[in-house]
Amino acid sequence: MDKQKFGLTAKKEEDFSEWYVQVITKGEMIDYYAIKGCYVMRPLGQFVWKCIHKWFTKKIEELGVQECYFPMLVPKSMLEMEKDHVENFSPEVAWITKCGNQVLEDPVAVRPTSETIIYPSFSKWIRSHRDLPLKLNQWCSVLRWELHGTLPFIRGKEFLWQEGHTAFLTRKESDEEVLAILDLYSQIYSELLAVPVIKGRKSENEKFGGADYTTSIEAFIPGSGRGVQAATSHSLGQNFSRMFDIKADTDEGSESSSFVYQNSWGITTRSIGIAAMIHSDNLGLVLPPRVAMTQVVIVPCGITTASSKDDTESLRAYINGVCVQLKNSGVRVHLDDRSNVTAGFKFNHWEIRGVPLRLEIGFKDMASSEACLVRRDTRAKKQVSVEGIAHTVMEEIDTMHNDMLARATSERDSRISYVKSFEEFMSALDNKNIIMAPWCGISECEIEIKSRSTRADPRSDVVSTGAKTLCIPYGSKPCDGMKCINCNSQAVHYTLFGRSY
């Protein structure tokens, strides 16, 4: 096979966008479809989402969240009930206006999100404080007709997500859940995807339309120097409950009632793209080992036409024994026993698909009761005993995960610049960093920062998008007595800025 067709032709450090597309397509995570911005999720990518689905479902069920499913269509009248909410999505809403040749009198939208679909039911189901809290979650797809450039996993017209919708009698309960869910999202990235994230609160300009406030986790993509919103947890306050008349009596026997406090929260398949962008290299995809569909591939080595039948059968039996050990211990293992391709071809085949560990087993390995273990992320090799090999492999999976997270964290931290002036701000931005800067918190100032930082990249003919607030990180250091980097007003908090997807 032509090496140029089999391997990557773009370099991560030279053409990041092309490199990324090659990683996820040649790595068989995703494929293109006839409609721009819609993608085919291949089994390798879908398995990662399945791991996230399984882990998160278990965690939220422990919090009392129940799974449900609501229709994907929303009447125009319902979608437009919350002004700020609909304005947030209006340019991206896809409308169904015809059925065959018949124009519909009442157009319906395909859900961009489900608040206005779900909350009419909440108003029917909630009457008493005994009906609270109500905690629902659905796994589904949404459609947002992106008008800007699309990028697989990161920004598409249709994508998969989960969306949680909850209602509480008190603000305290609501606020506690917002942060509890945000912590779970952070754990998805750290414990499954080996990706570090920053937890914080969105600015007023960047919060979800119709929310009291929005919290988010933000990741950093070193290859592009951009931040990316990794998940969000919103406090809706009583905004939607007032709109949809969702009320509950406040006490036993009381005739008074109050509007409930609501939250919504979600994570999407963007998470898969974030992990691929951060961990992959110029050889192809690098999958976090805990979510890889195949965690270990076994490649027999040294079998040729000159090998005796008895030796070959002995080696195959030895390899099968290793494979059974791993399978019985719950390791996801694949034996590549194809006879029509070389061992070298198999190495390349599995490297580009990101399989975390490779076991190379030949006649010498069998003679010493060993196998050669190769890590995908570092390409480091070592001989391991086949006695207790399942335990060895499981330890290596954890070590690899921890190493990947540590490397990504170190890289991210080295690219966070603390600045005190707009000149330092722009220098850091042009060096593809994200920035912690003292900021006044005023919306008009944020708009001006984005405008001022939109300029031609000095290293190309491309106009770089402006920086925006990514979040106001929780636990960031105080900025007492400092001035805003843009308007020179009194700064109220250090804020994370950056160009973003």
Swiss-Prot record:
It catalyses: tRNA(Pro) + L-proline + ATP = L-prolyl-tRNA(Pro) + AMP + diphosphate. Its EC number is 6.1.1.15. One of its GO terms (molecular function) is proline-tRNA ligase activity. Gene3D superfamilies: Anticodon-binding domain (3.40.50.800), Bira Bifunctional Protein, Domain 2 (3.30.930.10), C-terminal domain of ProRS (3.30.110.30). The keyword Cell division does not apply. It is an enzyme of class 6 (ligase). SMART domains: ProRS-C_1. It comes from the Eukaryota. GO terms for biological process: prolyl-tRNA aminoacylation. One of its GO terms (cellular component) is aminoacyl-tRNA synthetase multienzyme complex. Keywords: Aminoacyl-tRNA synthetase, ATP-binding, Ligase, Nucleotide-binding, Protein biosynthesis. Pfam families: HGTP_anticodon, ProRS-C_1, tRNA-synt_2b. Belongs to the class-II aminoacyl-tRNA synthetase family. This is Proline--tRNA ligase.
